[in-house]
A protein has these predicted regions:
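Carboxylate/His-rich catalytic cores and anion/metal-binding grooves
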Residues: 4, 9-12
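Alpha-helical protein-protein interaction modules
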Residues: 11-12, 22, 28-36, 42-54, ...
Length: 225
């Protein structure tokens, strides 16, 4: 039986802190590789393996695995979109956003998380008003990155009132996020300058974030991945 299910469970231990146990990424890697071995032409198995490589920071393995997953089923809009998101966050913004554009064309009624990379593309280039336009399209109030993204943008724009509301919403979903900000952002953005840029926006928004990258203990929080 393909091991995509266990792979997702193990990844969520790492991504969102559900039932955390030791070495979630190593367990995810073994399960994902077994899934690919059992189902070598399955795009979901290949995509699961690509995700594991991404979160392990092995971009050399991530890119070919991600490309293969899309090639095996180029019409699965969710897989194309998630691959685009991870590709963009891995630093290949043009390629990643191209995949997001294709995914949106495949599914005109796509979920709001498709807009995160578009918002951060404008954010990283200092186009904060455009970033805000895209971030507002996410419309996922129960997902903590929605409020984290808005807070960073509002912070950069100097819109104090909206920034504080976003911080309050963020902390309701993820108490203590400030002490975990470095760690959480580094799970997604592979480039240190991007992580620092987002931290800068969050600090301007009023969130207290330590100078060092502390690995404090936190429980599960509300969200997806």
């Amino acid at each position: 039986m393909p091991q995509r299910g266990p792979t997702s469970v193990y990844l969520d231990e790492f991504r969102v802190g559900f039932n955390p146990r030791p070495d979630p990424l190593e367990r995810a890697l073994k399960a994902a590789q077994m899934s690919v071995d059992l189902d070598p032409t399955g795009h979901l198995s290949q995509h699961a393996l690509a995700q594991v490589h991404f979160y392990r920071g092995d971009l050399e393995a991530f890119f070919p695995a991600a490309q293969k997953g899309v090639q095996l089923n180029p019409n699965d809009s969710t897989i194309v979109a998630m691959t685009g998101l991870l590709t963009a966050y891995a630093g290949e913004w043009e390629s990643g956003l191209g995949m997001l554009e294709k995914a949106m064309a495949l599914d005109p009624y796509h979920p709001g998380w498709y807009y995160f990379p578009l918002a951060f593309e404008h954010y990283r280039n200092g186009n904060y008003e455009r970033a805000l336009e895209e971030a507002r399209k996410v419309n996922m109030p129960g997902y903590y990155p929605t409020h984290m993204t808005l807070a960073a943008i509002y912070g950069q724009l100097g819109r104090t009132k909206e920034a504080l509301v976003s911080i309050e919403n963020l902390l309701q979903l993820f108490p203590g996020y400030g002490t975990r900000a470095w760690e959480e952002l580094e799970k997604w953005f592979t480039k240190p300058d991007m992580v620092e840029h987002v931290v800068e926006g969050l600090r301007k928004a009023g969130l207290e974030i330590p100078e060092d990258r502390r690995d404090d203990v936190a429980g599960p929080r509300s969200g997806v991945g």
